[in-house]
Amino acid sequence: MPHRSFTSDFMQNYRAPWWLPGGNLQTIWPALFARRTRGPVPEYRRERWTTPDGDFVDLDFLANDVSRRRPLLVLFHGLEGSSRSHYSEAFADVAWRGKLTYVVPHFRGCSGEMNLAPRAYHSGDHEEIGFILARLREMHQGPIIAVGVSLGGNALLRWAGECGESASRLASAVAAVCSPLDLAAGGHAIGRGFNRVVYTTMFLRTMKPKALRKWAQHPGLFDREALLQARDLYDFDNIFTAPVHGFTNTEDYWRRASAKPHLHRIRIPALALNSTNDPFIPADSLPRPEEVGDWVTLWQPGNGGHVGFPAGAFPGQVMAMPEAVTAWLLKASGITPRVPAEWPRAPMTVPAAL
């Protein structure tokens, strides 16, 4: 397992800037206003792959000319995310500066075009993770490292737990950032108070229209009238996500899709980063060291919000977390990045010769 370093110590002891107190501000401000990249906005080239069920997934590859022997960083996005989410662009910047290959596979329906099959995506979709990583492994000669953000991280660790030792055939190391590894705890938290008013409303604003478009593709797939009345993610999952993807109801979906009960089965280096002030994830639901086994490293700083982790002077930047997580993944794969003494003000880099 990778040992402690400057970057890991920084993240484990992370403190938000004084001008961004509290988990909600540390979540909302970075997503909307903080600087995402040290360089230009990343450019992508898109590939469309046919899936085993006759559908398609769209993958956005960073448009940099890099040898296939360099490490490949794969990012699985969060709920309603994409390659243009703030964290996706921040990780793309890390890859661009480190001359890494980088790709964001979009979950079904998240690339800007509705998928065709009578399904969407969900938090426990480890089969989709496995299909994508296996295809990338066929294409790429160098090591593959993968990070999942929020929903994508739960699915990624769920895949790693499901595969056990065989996961190492496809990936050298994996990481989950602010992932609701106990879906029931996270689902109930986001359905209460401020979270319900702000975050639930934001998610349903795009999720309900997409579900209705899916119903138009496949009439009768779910109870359309009930979906129109859904007021929170519990209802949405009960009416759409669970039955469409083979679960009995919301409770069954949350229980079977959660990665937390499977963390002890992971047999490749894995990192789970969660702030204890994440508005979406109760701190008392986070995994404890005795629950995860020797292959899983836990970073649980007191600050950071949900996929925030802002740093620096106003208006702040969000590159420190992606650089620290990428550094951990590289070290777990036997590659030592270069971290200057001025980091995170100055960027982490990756040696040209590997």
Question: What does each model-identified segment do?
Answer:
Residues I266, A272-N274, D278:
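Short beta-strand/loop motif that positions the catalytic acidic residue
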Residues R119-M139, R158:
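Alpha/beta-hydrolase active-site loop
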Residues P2-D9, H140-H245:
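Alpha/beta-hydrolase-fold enzymes
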Residues G23-V66, P310-G312, G316:
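N-terminal cap/lid segment of alpha/beta-hydrolase-fold proteins
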Residues I239-H262:
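Active-site nucleophile elbow and catalytic-triad environment of alpha/beta-hydrolase enzymes
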Residues T276-T297, P301:
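Conserved loop-alpha-helix segment in the C-terminal half of the alpha/beta-hydrolase fold
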